[in-house]
Amino acid sequence: MKKPFLTLITILIVSCAQTNNKANSENNCNSDPEYFLLRPEVEKAYGYSHAVKICNQIKISGAVSMDNQGSPTAVGNLEQQMKNCYSDLQKILKHFNSSFDDVVVENIFTTDMGKFLEVASYRNDIYGDRYPTGSWIGVKELALPEFMIEIELEVHVSEEKNEIEEYPDQDND
C-alpha cells in the first residue's frame, strides 16, 4: 500500500512541476515591444502606432479606409472601405510574419450596421471556417465623418512563427 501511494505522490509532484515550468516559460517574455507604423506621418501626427507586438501577442489599432496622406478613400462605399481595411490589416500581419489564421479577436465598428450585414460575408474569404472572437458595434461616427467602418485585431503568433521571425539566420530544423 505504501509503494503505490509514494508512486502517486511522485507523479503528482512531477506533473505539477512541469505545469509550473510551462506556465513560467510562457510568462517569461524578455523582448521589448515592437512598434509598427503603416503610415508613419499620419500615425505620428495623431499620436498612435498602428500595431504593437509584445512576445507572441500583436495588438492592431483600428484600420480605416485611407490613403497614405490620411485622407478617406471609397467615400460612401462601405463594402470597398471594408476591403481597404482588410488590405491594410494584411500588410501589418505580413510585417509580423503572421496571417488572418492567427487572429483571435476582431472588433468591427461601423456607422451603418445594416449595410455592413449585407457585405459581411466578404469575411468568409478572409477567415475561411476559423473565425476569431469579437464584436460588431454600431457607432454614430468614427474619427472622420467619411469613415464608415473601422476594424481592429488582436493576434496570437505561435512560438514556431516567433522563432522563425526572431532568428531568421539560424537553421530551424
Which functions belong to the PLM regions below?
Residues 16-87, 91-96, 101, 110-173:
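N-terminal presequence-like segments and the immediate start of the first folded domain
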Residues 4-13:
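Sec-dependent N-terminal signal peptides
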